[in-house]
């Protein structure tokens, strides 16, 4: 028999002040799956005046966390940040292929906002002055060239849509995961790179509250002016995109494999990859199965 860790629902006092609703549980299958169920039942915050309402779904432990394409999502109770955020945006924006790829980038950029803002508040500094945070397109968070976490963005339809859809932004970050419990040799944890930091429970609340604030600000601007904000997001991503100029091997959902150099981040949040034959392949966020 496998003994389950005794866990408690996370205390998110700061986050409760920043968000419209917080649903915190001791142990569930996954915050993302729970968020989908809340959406199906219409049990999440909405804002009738056109603002961005945010519902936070958190748990002390998850028994079946899943990321993109149903892949297992590593989460160590008491050491990981793993929270889902529910928002509503106009369906016209969420279904517009010219701009909707940027929603995944917004999740990553908001996560960087939250982490970097929290480190500033704590007075935390990196052990290595060259240590920095980047985003690996389309959904990974990198620290000093190693995977610190990832995001998962998914659109869901509430029962009464009224021209809007719900979007789930799930964010996972290794905060204090010991080296021997990291999921891969290419993974890392925040405490391995910066100090001082508060206890992990407090750190989770600080990051979550800042993530709510950043998501609200970024999404409000995005839904008001999608094309203008897409251009601004593209410029911002160029500064933090870990993949620009690098060689990649991408396994696509359709079964193909593309290998080559990332040469551009495009207006619709896709990337262009130049293969060994000199041809350029355009890849969207929805094309990717696995990328190394």
Across the structure, where does each feature detected by a protein language model lie?
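Residue-level signal for inorganic ion chemistry
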Residues: 31, 83-85, 111, 140, ...
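Short beta-strand segments
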Residues: 58-60, 84, 136, 152-154, ...
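Conserved, helical-rich catalytic subdomain that frames metal- and/or nucleotide-binding sites
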Residues: 195-255
